[in-house]
Amino acid sequence: MEILEKEGPAYERRKQRFQSWYESVFKWHPNFMYTPNQVINWTEIKKPMSEWKVGLVSSSGAHLRSQKPFDIVSDEGDWSYREIPVETDPKDIMISDSHYDHSDADLDVNCMFPILTLKELVKDGVISSIPSKFYSFMGFVPVPQDLITQTAPEVAQKLADEKVDVVILTPGCAVCHQTLGIIQNIIEGVGITTIMTTLKPELTEQVHVPRAAYLKYPYGYSAGPANDLNMQKTIVKDVLELIPVIKEPGSIVKMPYRWHGHIE
């Protein structure tokens, strides 16, 4: 297990990449508010993985085709969320988000919103169960005040009401990494253990999240490659297996998977 160091040359390079991104983001989104978690919430789980009820929260912009799409026009973003029943056919899920390329996810939403993956892990006995609903945000929320005070706490409470043990979170765009880190920390604060996948560890570590798994994939594949359920299952299982071995809040573990192609 390779945990990203919080000091030294590699950390300084990531910090510089974050600073470069932070300076550039205002060219496109002048109202962006950098909003790191001031305190990292931390909940340990004592049960074995085979007894976990695992929930899913994504900032991919996924929603049912029958639901109102997310607002991709507002300068302040859209901090609302959509409830997606777990029995939903993945073909009935679409993505509304103009801030990353989700072309492959439009054909296989499971690479961003791993609804089928988690159901398969229940069948395989890897985890015990899943709740009745999963949750999706459109992660472009440059002004996250209402997310922090309203919608993220609502979702956290709904997960707690269903007695969810663990939540896995998957991001969409760059700003989504901050949005998802905020949501993650709020969920962890109600006593649910969480882990997020990150495609940009330089962003995630500056948001200060409980724990994360760095997947060196491009935007649009935060739960694995498209049209490869076996690899999606392997990745999500491996991410979940990190939870009991990560002991320090704020840790990011580098996963051993590599994308065969260009990554921005």
Where are the model-predicted features located?
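Metallocofactor- and cofactor-centric catalytic cores in central/energy metabolism, strongly enriched
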Residues: 1-264
